[in-house]
From Swiss-Prot:
It is found in: Cytoplasm. This is 3-phosphoshikimate 1-carboxyvinyltransferase. Keywords: Amino-acid biosynthesis, Aromatic amino acid biosynthesis, Cytoplasm, Transferase. It comes from Rhizobium johnstonii (strain DSM 114642 / LMG 32736 / 3841). GO terms for biological process: amino acid biosynthetic process; aromatic amino acid family biosynthetic process; chorismate biosynthetic process.
Length: 452
């Protein structure tokens, strides 16, 4: 359930070939950062293609609460920022709902300010650990008051003068890296982040685009050193947000597993730190054609033509996990229809997502007749290319645990399974992909809400 709203069960059934051309909503990572950095920059920022899911809107509301002016003009969002270093103390707690990215990055953005700011979220977000972001802020001199286990609610109070730090990110996390860099914007001197494993680099690209003095060096081992000069001026920009690769994954995998499908997905973000899923599916034999590749706002963008394919199981390299961590649930669905076993390792990060995503996937697969093994940090799926025996003839419902990606992944599973697949709640899909149901049914997918 979302913000107290009633749950909405949904069912997906075996579908005929999916066809058509679709445009995916804007990338969630870039949308969050557009509101944050646009809200902080001097002058006007204009954004088209913004993802208008609840998570991103909550980030926008938080920026408004700290002095940014945000309005919508037609299809564009227009922001008048406060200027770097000029955020105002919020009058009330900042409520991020289900948005892990929003809350963690905003903690970095405002944590170093010399005022109190309190962060709250929904039941799911309140279970997620915040310590990985709070620890570097503590090193910068921020006073932290948090619930047990460094969970929400969290209250921060910045020092009079924050100290720049040199911080080595202890896990592959774009959120931690970004929080430290955003904290560095209001910190005198040079803030340095060392990243042993490269993660999505939208924060670095966008800060450079807004005029921050930021440099990136990569050594022979692939270790990145990012340096940011604090307290510089940021100037408003015009941003066109490309389609979200994590949302693209759902119609893309659906087309691969439903016989007779041939779809085109236009304007997809193809940043190399985000394309692990596409690479993995191609290794499995997926027919994914990248067309009209181009650069837009410093990011790689392309259209994808996707056709039904006979997939083979693979072992996914562990070092690919950071570039596709959000896509493992839908990759597991693709693996259900592949010949042989698909082995996914290095998945410990999935246990601290919107749900314990690894268990949620494994439990849902078993409920729907899939042969799989779950370990502490791995998942093995043995496929049935014909979909025979998959699904749940007894109307057993997948527990989504308030997790939008679990919900969408299992609805895709039902499109090629012998029996229907039903999930206990589709309401939270609105956090990241409000148009999901309409877009999928428009391609020919048999997905519908269940009348209770």
């Amino acid at each position: 359930m979302l913000n107290g709203s009633a749950s909405k069960p949904a069912t997906a059934r075996k579908s005929a070939g999916l066809t058509g051309s679709v445009r995916i909503p804007g990338d969630k990572s870039i949308s969050h950062r557009s509101f944050m950095i646009g809200g902080l920059a001097s002058g006007e920022t204009r954004i088209t293609g913004l993802l208008e899911g609840e998570d991103v809107i909550n980030t926008g509301r938080a920026m408004q609460a700290m002095g940014a002016r945000i309005r919508k003009e037609g299809a564009q969002w227009v922001i008048e920022g406060t200027g770097n270093g000029a955020l105002l103390a919020p009058d009330a707690p900042l409520d991020f709902g289900n948005a892990g990215t929003g809350v963690r990055l905003t903690m970095g953005l405002v944590g170093t300010y010399d005022f109190h700011s309190t962060f709250i979220g929904d039941a799911s977000l309140s279970k997620r650990p915040m310590g990985r972001v709070l620890n570097p802020l503590r090193e910068m001199g921020v006073q932290v008051s948090a619930s047990e286990g460094d969970r929400l609610p969290v209250t921060l109070r910045g020092p009079g003068t924050p100290s720049p730090i040199r911080y080595r990110v202890p896990m592959a996390s774009a959120q931690v890296k970004s929080a430290v860099l955003l904290a560095g914007l209001n910190t005198p001197g040079v803030t340095t982040v060392i990243e042993p494993v490269m993660t999505r680099d939208h924060t670095e690209k966008m800060l450079q685009g807004f005029g921050a003095a930021l440099s990136v060096e990569t050594d022979g081992d692939g270790v990145r050193t990012i340096r940011l000069e604090g307290r510089g001026k940021l100037a408003g920009q015009v941003i066109d947000v490309p389609g979200d690769p994590s949302s693209t994954a759902f119609p893309l995998v659906a087309a691969l597993i439903v016989p007779g499908s041939d779809i085109t997905i236009v304007n997809v973000l193809m940043n190399p730190t985000r394309t692990g899923l596409i690479l993995t599916l191609q290794e499995m034999g997926a027919d994914i054609e990248v067309v009209n590749a181009r650069l837009a706002g410093g990011e790689d963008v392309a259209d994808l033509r996707v056709r039904h394919s006979e997939l083979k199981g693979v072992t996914v390299p562990e070092d690919r996990a950071p570039s596709m961590i959000d896509e493992y649930p839908i990759l597991a669905v693709a693996a259900c229809f592949a010949e042989g076993a698909t082995v996914m390792k290095g998945l410990e990060e999935l246990r601290v997502k919107e749900s314990d995503r690894l268990s949620a996937v494994a439990d849902g697969l078993k409920l729907n007749g899939v042969d799989c093994d779950e370990g502490e940090d791995f998942l093995i799926v043995r496929g049935r290319p014909d979909g025979k025996g998959l699904g749940n003839a007894a109307d057993g419902r997948v527990s989504t645990h308030l997790d939008h990606r679990i919900a969408m992944s299992f609805l895709v599973l039902g499109l090629a399974s012998e029996h229907a697949v039903t999930i206990d709640d589709a309401a939270m899909i609105a956090t990241s992909f409000p148009e999901f149901m309409q877009l999928m049914t428009g391609l020919g997918a048999k997905i519908e809400l269940v009348a209770e």
